[in-house]
Amino acid sequence: MEMDLNNRLTEDETLEQAYDIFLELAADNLDPADIILFNLQFEERGGAELFDPSEEWQEHVDFDLNPDFFAEVVIGLADTEDGEINNIFARVLLCREKNHKLCHILWRE
């Protein structure tokens, strides 16, 4: 898979794309109670944070997760308004190269 460093989503575009995918698929993958909690609390304590892909993804995909081209977006709630997300609803793995649409999601169990 050949990728171009000059044809990548920005960090903001990556976050936005991951969040849009999360919203589209959440109803099919989360408990109704979790969806209600997320919707009620997101404005005050919710967030999406961008990271390099964690090692855990190697258990789920069979390709190299070069951080130049892949990002992990953690979506969830924090205990406080400015706190770190610790109540995770989904972890989204995205390819940032615009010509390679690839997404994997690990949902809250």
From Swiss-Prot:
Domain of life where this protein originates: Bacteria
Coiled coil: none
Family: Belongs to the putative dsDNA mimic protein family.
Described function: May act as a double-stranded DNA (dsDNA) mimic. Probably regulates the activity of a dsDNA-binding protein.
Protein name: Putative double-stranded DNA mimic protein YciU
